Swiss-Prot record:
<comment type="pathway">
    <text>One-carbon metabolism; tetrahydrofolate interconversion.</text>
</comment>
<dbReference type="InterPro" id="IPR027417">
    <property type="entry name" value="P-loop_NTPase"/>
</dbReference>
<dbReference type="Pfam" id="PF01268">
    <property type="entry name" value="FTHFS"/>
</dbReference>
<dbReference type="GO" id="GO:0035999">
    <property type="term" value="P:tetrahydrofolate interconversion"/>
</dbReference>
<keyword id="KW-0067">ATP-binding</keyword>
<dbReference type="InterPro" id="IPR000559">
    <property type="entry name" value="Formate_THF_ligase"/>
</dbReference>
<protein>
    <recommendedName>
        <fullName>Formate--tetrahydrofolate ligase</fullName>
        <ecNumber>6.3.4.3</ecNumber>
    </recommendedName>
</protein>
<dbReference type="InterPro" id="IPR020628">
    <property type="entry name" value="Formate_THF_ligase_CS"/>
</dbReference>
<comment type="similarity">
    <text>Belongs to the formate--tetrahydrofolate ligase family.</text>
</comment>
<keyword id="KW-0436">Ligase</keyword>
<dbReference type="GO" id="GO:0005524">
    <property type="term" value="F:ATP binding"/>
</dbReference>
<keyword id="KW-0547">Nucleotide-binding</keyword>
<feature type="binding site">
    <location>
        <begin position="63"/>
        <end position="70"/>
    </location>
    <ligand>
        <name>ATP</name>
    </ligand>
</feature>
<keyword id="KW-0554">One-carbon metabolism</keyword>
<dbReference type="GO" id="GO:0004329">
    <property type="term" value="F:formate-tetrahydrofolate ligase activity"/>
</dbReference>
Amino acid sequence: MSSDLEIARAAKLRPIATVADEAKIPAEALHSYGLHVAKIDTSLLPKKDRPAKLVLVTAINPTPAGEGKTTTTIGLGDALRRLGKACVIALREPSLGPCFGTKGGATGGGYAQIVPMERINLHLTGDFHAITSAHNLLAALIDNHLYWGAEPKIDSRKVAWRRVLDMNDRALRQIVVGLGGGGNGYPRETGFDITAASEIMAIFCLSKDLADLQQRLAQIIVAQDVNKQPVRADALQAVGAMTVLLKDALMPNLVQTLEGTPTFVHGGPFANIAHGCNSVAATLAAMQLGDYVVTEAGFGADLGAEKFLDIKCRQAGIAPSAAVIVATARALKSHGGVAPADLNKENLDALKAGLANLGRHIANVKKFGLPVVVAINHFLSDTEAEQELIAHTCRDEYGVEAIDCRHWAAGGKGALALAEKVIALVEGGTAQFKMLYEDTLPLIEKMRRIAQEIYGAADISLDAKAKKQLADIEAQGFGHFPVCVAKTQYSFAADPKLLGAPTGHIVPIREVRLSAGAGFVVMICGDIMTMPGLSRQPAAWKIGLDAQGNIEGLF
């Protein structure tokens, strides 16, 4: 079979104006970026009395074998359109870090892709650049404020705002700025995070409109002053310029699938170190256009789905009508202890052991009151016995249906059975959405509930630094915020080596960060880093141009 890149290049894309017109997007709302990409002015969209039904796609804990969550999201959207439903897909934008690192892009695969694939994976309309620029403008204004000794007097030892870059670069995790003499400012320790972990990214993705964005930017707490009082971005007169940088970027990007399904690609926070959901602006816009909106949350349901349901839905006032959990026989065998080299071999004992991971994710999503269906993303190495074991276990032990899906090879046609089941779940009206915790629960108890109810942990632990940070945040009046957990994506535990469905473990919290503008508190667990590093053999080694100027090695 052709590679993803070859399939994407062979596709006959429709003009984005045609895609927009079929989605009932007014021509005056369309800001074209070439023939196949546009931004949408959401203020000009028609308002529906009954917004579309929202379907959340999530997955088991990821493995090197891959699950195909984005591919399934796209295949499901195409299948719903084949069944006559007006469907819009809402996805996150890819980050350059994973594209040049290990994970790769985020445009799906096979015949379930969004296009133009190369452009989406590399810059798209420049939103990440705008977010990076706005974030680093605030950082520059902080150091300029320190240099001139302006009021309020910032304590240079208490600056919390780091810089960001949309790249995996471990050398920038801890740095010293202001070296080289008094003309270069005050030396102090700081560091870089990846743009996807930026609070500006979170604010960007949680803002409903420009007014909401500007209000959130003003609330960012960047430091303490010499009297131990919080210093906000508005005190540095930063908000107006930051908003200007983000104004056009806040308009959602419209692209299409290989089958022409309209797709919003907007915002890109990671789910392991941020909240892992596409923008509220894009999701709300999609819900005004279609009968169904299919969206995804990053990594496994323990991270992305929990944050989608406890953070995004809480702040945006939305609720899904059903959830799809993606798994593969290969990934389940990996959770059952099979080495990567042996994943193509049938191993029913390992598969049975690995199914415990899927079972916990199913139980967790049900705790939010959502009906669930499992999508088994089919691989050529899957055997009939493996498919039967998955189906029987899901039905008999977990009380859900598992559907064999072949959208990678067949596009929307390969996900028709999944789409029919999703329609049945949605139209059955059984969803009774509820969040895992109330706003009034103390922050430490919110974290404990997530750890025990979602991760299967015995308890949590906080070191002295984290305890003080948590106490300070509570004292400042932010105890009502939801919790955003930064944790390894590979396990329910903070240890990435604990596969399957571990129980009885302790979740160690080493740092607590306040994101006052985004409206949540970040709990950093274990060894997770907010600036990733490149792998021993980064994907960047294989990427280049051929003699005709075409990109090679992207996927």
